[in-house]
Amino acid sequence: RRASIANTVDGNTAILASTAFADIFGAGSQSGDTIRINGTTHDGSTLSRVFTIEDAATTTVGDLLSEVRSMFGGNVSANIDSEGRVVITDNQVGSSNLTLTLIEENEGGGSLNFGSIEVETEGRLGLDITASNRDNRLAIEHNGFGDRNGFTIS
């Protein structure tokens, strides 16, 4: 999942995890501003937490990302990409219900906005295969039969 808005420090240079909230271009973040973090875990459980920008000059975007990772029990990766967008990745395999919403309350009158966080890359369905040890060698077999059931290892 990737945020729709790229934030910068000067209108061109992307923010980093180490960027203080006060340094996000045009955001006007103030100490005491809050960001509501709402999410759905891999298995569909709902989560919610409030992140407070204690000191806009020293609280960083990385602090927010750490709070996101903590809220999901370390089962997600949360980063800033090269364009200054929040990216969250489910670290668990299989079909995922992962969602993340950041609601910037801007109590101090600012306009901080990370945008909506949408699916960027969907995983694919798993293959119905079995791996086993056959005579001390790895054997990988498809569990279905017929010409339509195959796979390639490259």
State the predicted function of each range:
Residues 46-62:
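Short, contiguous acidic and Ser/Thr-rich linear segments
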Residues 1, 59-73, 121-122:
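Amphipathic, non-transmembrane alpha-helical segments in extracytoplasmic/periplasmic proteins
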